[in-house]
């Protein structure tokens, strides 16, 4: 029986304009967004986040909250 190759998303982040995404590889910040993170998946639209560079979350080591449209990393 054939199986789907479903990616395991490891990183979660928000860009300057509020878009929250997950990706498979550690992305780099470029301009106002995250790039080069392998496969991506859209999660949610939030609010514009001037601190977007602080939103890169490694889901294997940290937790997060998404409140009032802003993604925040929570250290475990």
Predicted features and spans:
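Amphipathic alpha-helical oligomerization segments
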Residues: 4-22
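Low-complexity intrinsically disordered segments
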Residues: 35-76
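Short, surface-exposed terminal/edge motifs of secreted or surface/virion proteins that either
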Residues: 18-29, 33
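Phosphate-interacting basic helix/loop segments used at nucleotide- and nucleic-acid interfaces
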Residues: 1
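Residues in intrinsically disordered, low-complexity segments of regulatory proteins
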Residues: 8-10, 33, 51
């Amino acid at each position: 029986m054939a199986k789907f190759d479903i990616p395991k998303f490891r990183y979660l982040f928000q860009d300057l304009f509020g878009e929250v995404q997950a990706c498979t590889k550690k992305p780099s910040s470029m301009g106002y967004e995250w790039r080069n993170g392998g496969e991506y998946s859209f999660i949610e639209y939030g609010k514009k986040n001037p601190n977007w560079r602080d939103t890169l979350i490694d889901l294997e080591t940290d937790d997060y909250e998404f409140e009032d449209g802003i993604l925040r990393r929570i250290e475990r």
